[in-house]
Amino acid sequence: DPFDSRLDDELERARLRRVFSQGLDHAVGYLLPLQATGHEGARWSSGPWFFRDERMYLVPGDSPMGYRLPLDSLPWVSPAEYPHTLAQDPFAPARDLPHAAVLRAQYASHARFTRYDPHTAGHGFAEGGTVSLQTAEPARFASAHWITRTGLCVEVRDPARANGPEVEMGEHTHSGVLYVFMPPLSHLDDYLDLLAAVEATAEELGVQIVLEGYGPPRDARLKLLQVTPDPGVIEVNIHPAHDWPEVVEHTEFLYQAAFESRLSAEKFMTDGRHTGTGGGNHVVLGGATPADSPFLRKPELLASLVLYWHNHPSLSYLFSGLFIGPTSQAPRVDEARNDQIYELEIALREIQRNRQIHGQDMPPWLVDRTLRNILIDVTGNTHRSEFCIDKLYSPDSSTGRLGLLELRAFEMPPHERMSIVQQLLLRALVARFWIEPYSAPATRWGTELHDRFMMHHWVRQDFDDVLTELGDSGFHFDPAWFAPHFEFRFPKVGEVQVDGMTLTLRNALEPWHVMGEEGAIGGTVRYVDSSLERIEVQVSGINPSRHSVTVNGQSLPLQPTGVAGIWVASVRYKAWNPPSALHPSIGVHAPLTFDIVDTWMKRSLGGCQYHVAHPGGRNYDTFPVNAYEAESRRLARFFRMGHTPGRMAGVQPTLGVPASREFPFTLDLR
């Protein structure tokens, strides 16, 4: 934008200084017009580019040269004859790729020979080479469809400019690096052929190069490892694994490589809580090729996974991150709309009906269109869903027809073995439903979803059912394998014992909601209300007709767990008071004082206190340096004392405490 130079930004000032200092007569780089022909004989075509002033001026900026080519200044071509670069159909048959030695031998110094004929025009080929030269000049008002409109760009840049203006303008050695901009191509064979030519040229000249531009076309024959910087994390997309040992090898290598790079898959919050990085540990399932995808070959497998995840909320919440709920990155099906389960049941019946009609020849697009408008979030986004089918079989583009299912309700665990056992669980569930599809009725959880299943006890009970069902199907899992996941997801805050009664506190889950739009500089923003937190309270050994547990003087609606003498409930409270919150007039409820009250004697037998911040008023402004400091910060916020002294009248025993109709397992201090 020429009217918004953003001179306040140091990086923008450095960019403008760099652009204006080089001048208009400075040669940025070199362009070789190049295009794959797509037929036998000469594999490549080239030719001159025609400009009115016989000079090629790039679009202003400092991006790579290939992104700034003045393609609109080339001779006119009719829309019907424009040479679009189209992606190949992923279901098209493909032959084996040539060996690397064959490609290198093709471009050896003794094998390269291209003859240029100045009279060659149109689609004529030069003899003895692999490149056809097209030199015909376009006539007036004629469509110049033969002109090559893609090219290989080569330029020299100083890589130090990527480290900021201080390094760029500092006293460092200004050394240029040769950057080769790869053009867009449709076939992987052409990309590898061009890459072999670039490699042979660089090797003969003895120069080091950096590839940039367009990546290779998506192809099942190519293993692709992508590393992308994201805010706060580095996203790594690993190439597919074909068997279980390869899955273990990939996961262990990823964690080890991150450790050697001084990166970690965990972090500690300011208050010392151990959490994930916030980045996803998304699992992508599919086949070696799109045609081999188990979800397209057997659509009831996908239906079984969706229905099973719905009936077992522990699979949605045990491995997710802190941000859960209808506006999170991976909401459940029943968190989108109230009638979504009703529509899901209709969609699953349609899959079953079409399967009976078409049998093994069921069109794959039916699976996509049946579930595309079901697996969405509250805004209709198909990507922000627990089960993302954007790359299953979307007819919109070839990159959407890959037969892949992405499970997004997984956060990066802190240890590689925690990630490995997650993937082992998924493999077992896929194998189970491949043999015997899941056909149980869908459960209407209602408000139980954000009530019961926010607590450690009920998530563990539901997950134990999952492991039991897998064991009955021949897939035996030791529950101890998932003990680190429960301790990581529901960390223990503290425990106190009074007269044979035990009171245990654990962090529980809390769905955060997105607030309404608010005005901000340059537009509008929508804040996330993270001011609410939840604590699970588990008590054992009490007499429910005599004892009661209170939080800041309010009786807790303890519920039986099915185990004699153990009662559980959760406390929802406002931990801090941000400028934008759901109820801004409600103050902070911390510290929380828990009392085990003897209603017969009308006094507190004992209890504990939990502080959200340091009880001495210390305000930490840095993150913990290691796990030991984080643990000390957590322990400093829990006290096995501080219960309410004196007489406590009017407290009802556990059996007489009224519970909320919407959230019977939760005491909301608001």
Regions found by a protein language model. Give the residues of each.
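C-terminal accessory/tail domains of diverse enzymes
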Residues: 1-209, 215-232, 239-277, 288-670
